Design a protein with these regions (language model features):
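Cationic-aromatic interfacial patches
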Residues: 1-70
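Terminal peptide-recognition signature
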Residues: 18, 47, 123, 145, ...
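Surface-exposed, glycine-biased beta-strand/turn segments
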Residues: 64-171
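Small beta-strand-rich domains/subdomains or short beta-sheet motifs embedded
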Residues: 146, 152-156, 187-188, 198-201, ...
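Zn2+-dependent peptidoglycan hydrolase active-site motif and core
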Residues: 156-194, 219
């Protein structure tokens, strides 16, 4: 989280990791934004603060932050997982809908309380795990909770449902909630969806039930959090907002 204070804070932009971000008003004279980190980002990184001026070039101020490396585990998926992906290939139009939703940036902030875990269940797969299928590999951009089918799933925080869809090949039945200011949460592989696109939801409101839909080999909830369109560890956000 980056906070900028001062009368001209609203005229500032931030450049970090090759992207430009616009902070949001938090209170009088205070602007802030969550800056996401890539999973492999480590070491000293430059952060550039731009102060936009109407009568001249922007002023730039450089800061450096030290990023601790993240340990990344790798698991090798078996033939069952490979066969499932072959029989249920990802569909471009479905993927585009999900990508558009997770990249949504709504200036309004919907939440005021800490984020929380969305289901009662054991963690079966952690964030950032590298999955190797032999011919290719990919990272697990969320946390999987193992739970019985039909277990209630609730919102991690208040927000607006921006995507409610069923029958997606990869994600199954899904809900995506916009919490405002670039914070988006995802709930995949549901058996039942209880909210529609456009619905406003409160923190800890039941929105669906755990299922086994899409690319899934057993009942579980895939819970993901995106900041400014980039996946981050959901438990980091839960911990940070609880301080």
């Amino acid at each position: 989280m980056l906070q900028i204070e001062g009368r001209s804070a609203g005229d500032c932009r931030v450049r970090f990791e090759g992207k430009r971000y616009t902070p949001f008003p938090a209170s009088r004279g205070v602007w802030e934004i969550f800056l996401p980190l890539g999973i492999k980002t480590a070491g000293e990184r430059e952060l550039i603060l731009e102060r936009i001026s109407s009568d001249g070039p922007a002023e730039e101020y450089s800061f450096y932050v030290e990023v601790a490396p993240r340990e990344i585990r790798t698991i090798h998926l078996g033939k069952a997982s490979q066969a499932m992906r072959s029989s249920q290939p990802s569909i471009p139009e479905q993927q585009k809908k999900v990508l558009k939703a997770i990249r949504n940036v709504e200036p309004k902030r919907y939440w005021t309380r800490p984020f929380s875990s969305p289901v009662q269940g054991e963690i079966s797969t952690e964030f950032g795990l590298r999955r190797d299928l032999g011919t290719y590999s990919y990272y697990h951009w969320g946390v999987d909770f193992s739970a019985a089918e039909g277990t209630p799933v609730w919102t991690a925080n208040s927000g607006k449902v921006i995507l409610s869809e069923s029958g997606f090949n990869v994600y199954g039945n899904l809900l995506i909630i916009d919490h405002g200011q670039g914070v988006v949460s995802c709930y995949f592989h549901l058996s039942k969806i209880l909210k529609e696109t456009g619905d406003m939801v409160d923190r800890n409101e039941v929105i669906g039930e755990v299922g086994n839909t899409g690319w899934s080999t057993g009942p579980h909830l895939h819970f993901a959090v995106y900041l400014q369109g980039r996946a981050v560890d959901p438990f980091w956000l839960v911990s940070f907002t609880s301080k």
